[in-house]
């Protein structure tokens, strides 16, 4: 036996008792004649007092110990209110070394978050001893447990889908696994359980979910872990888009209410719904951060009637701000704009008499100035910024200027989680290089208008039943009403340049299953890692994953990816080329 109680179970009730505790040496303090050890386990820290110097012989920080001693009250002047056991201490009578430290520690455990990430990841098992780092993983476990119970309570059945599956074109690069038995054949790790969950609906299951591992060979971002991530994947039969919305917003709202920091404000249900077109206009992106009160306006038509040549023939966006701005602020904002690739950033300041001051004032006819004020809702003290370019670039630039203004002027709502749905995404898009029409997102989404729309409309005008959930500018989930009709599916793929044979080859299981009476179905998949990153207010998603890869998709701790033996390569019929 190594311990009687954990640190969280110890209290003043044990005073006068002989106890055995176990943990790691967090700190050693020598006060001349008496020494102290801060002993840490997963649950907390306990002060151990050493009055026999021989007990400390050979003891160093981060050794794993079992200590037997008498529980005592601390002297009142030495109380530590920062820890639950701050009024008690253990007087050591016996110390057993359970795990020695043979090498110099690469960093101080308590300050591990302050060192270089590559060192932290190489010694992640030490980094995780830091209570602040460990707390994220404990928190993650609690959130996942809650999500699992919530879905079960809502009538969903948890079903595991295969990890080794067939490769299919789903947007990102696959991780492929060679077959030993079938020369030249490969499995793929699933980018998502997409086809399997749809096959479950075709199998007659009504509501499915799982905490699903997903694997994508793509580059890292602050909110995207390379290699592997987890999502709360769910699918439902006999439902509309609105039915899925109700489930998604209930799960996310209730999860954030339970786990968000105390005092946080969370969007009430139903979440606002913003079309893709509206999002691109008002926010400059399809991931709107609703904590930022600034909105983007379209003033294209107005400026076609003015004489400012750089705006004529271009899409013109405007952002109105009511805030004090110095000349230096304008210069910094212009510098930011040029760093994005913009040629400049026009603006007007509104004076008390509602006259304008700014470089483009003289290009607006006098009789039109009141029209601009009414259109943009201008008042004295406002500044309005203008962005002009091709439509896609104007949206992109305006979105970044909006974000920069919100951050630099401290306009972003604090302690808030602001959710929305973004829907009505385009079904198809034009590849700017090949000029070929392809799917915008998931190829098996149901087009709005069904087969008639595919037969009669310009493909680039067709919308899909696709939707995202966005929170604070972070895409938390994507989903769609699925295309379960073979005829609609064949036509949609034909528009995107795929013949029926390709459909059968690449998505054979779905193609075959949908020949036998597939039900209407829809679903979504909120990202677990991103959810926890937001709830913990972490800037990097790797902080909420126990053993994350680095930004280059390397496991610095275990050395993956690594080399394998020639024998292993031969067994799977692979030869590595230089």
Regions found by a protein language model. Name each.
Residues 1-578:
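Class II aminoacyl-tRNA synthetase catalytic cores and aaRS-like
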């Amino acid at each position: 036996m190594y311990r009687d109680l954990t640190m969280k179970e110890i209290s003043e009730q044990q005073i006068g008792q002989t106890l055995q505790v176990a943990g790691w040496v967090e700190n050693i303090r020598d006060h001349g004649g008496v020494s102290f050890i801060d002993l840490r386990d997963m649950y907390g820290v306990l002060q151990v007092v050493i009055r026999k110097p021989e007990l400390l012989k050979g003891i160093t920080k981060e050794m794993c110990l079992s200590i037997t001693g008498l529980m005592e009250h601390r002297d009142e002047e030495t109380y530590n209110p920062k820890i639950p056991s701050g009024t008690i201490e253990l007087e050591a009578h016996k110390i057993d070394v359970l795990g020695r430290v043979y090498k110099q520690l690469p960093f101080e455990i308590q300050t591990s978050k302050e060192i270089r990430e590559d060192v932290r990841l190489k010694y992640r098992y030490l980094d995780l001893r830091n209570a602040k780092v460990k707390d994220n993983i404990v928190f993650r476990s609690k959130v996942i447990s809650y999500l699992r119970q919530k879905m079960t309570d809502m009538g969903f059945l948890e079903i595991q889908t295969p990890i080794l599956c067939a490769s299919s074109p789903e947007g990102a690069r696959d991780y492929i696994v060679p077959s030993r038995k079938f020369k030249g054949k490969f499995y793929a790790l699933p980018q998502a359980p997409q086809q399997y969950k749809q096959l479950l609906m075709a199998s007659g299951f009504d509501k499915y979910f799982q905490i699903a591992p997903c694997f994508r060979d793509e580059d890292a971002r602050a909110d995207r872990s390379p290699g592997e991530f987890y999502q709360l994947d769910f699918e439902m039969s006999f439902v509309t888009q609105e039915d899925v919305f109700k489930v998604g917003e209930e799960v996310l709202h209730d999860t954030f209410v339970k786990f968000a920091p105390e005092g946080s404000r969370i969007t009430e249900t139903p979440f606002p719904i913003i079309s893709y077109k509206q999002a691109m206009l008002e926010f400059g992106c399809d991931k709107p951060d609703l904590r930022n009160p600034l909105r983007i306006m379209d003033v294209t038509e107005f400026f076609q009637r003015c004489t400012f040549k750089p705006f004529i023939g271009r899409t013109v966006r405007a952002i109105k701000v009511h805030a004090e701005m110095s000349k230096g602020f304008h210069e910094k904002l212009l510098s930011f704009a040029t760093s994005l690739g913009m040629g400049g950033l026009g603006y007007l300041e509104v004076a008390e008499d509602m006259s304008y001051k700014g470089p483009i004032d003289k290009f607006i006819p006098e009789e039109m100035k009141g029209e601009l004020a009414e259109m943009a809702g201008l008042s004295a003290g406002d500044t309005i910024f203008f962005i002009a370019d091709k439509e896609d670039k104007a949206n992109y630039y305006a979105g970044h200027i909006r974000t920069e203004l919100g951050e630099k002027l401290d306009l972003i709502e604090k302690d808030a989680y602001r959710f929305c749905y973004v829907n009505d995404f385009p079904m198809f898009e034009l590849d700017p290089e090949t000029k070929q029409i392809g799917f915008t997102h998931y190829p098996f989404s149901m087009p709005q208008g069904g087969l008639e729309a595919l037969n009669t409309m310009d493909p680039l005008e067709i919308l899909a039943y696709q939707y995202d959930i966005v929170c604070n500018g972070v895409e938390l989930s994507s989903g769609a009403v699925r295309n379960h009709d073979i005829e609609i599916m064949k036509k949609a793929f034909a528009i995107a340049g795929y013949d029926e044979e390709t459909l059968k080859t690449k998505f054979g299981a779905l193609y075959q299953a949908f020949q036998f009476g597939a039900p209407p179905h829809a679903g979504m998949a909120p990202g677990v890692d991103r959810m926890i990153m937001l709830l913990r207010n972490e800037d990097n998603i790797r902080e909420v994953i126990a053993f994350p890869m680095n930004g280059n998709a390397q496991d610095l701790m275990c050395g993956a990816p690594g080399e394998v033996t020639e024998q292993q390569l031969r067994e799977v019929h692979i030869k590595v080329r230089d």
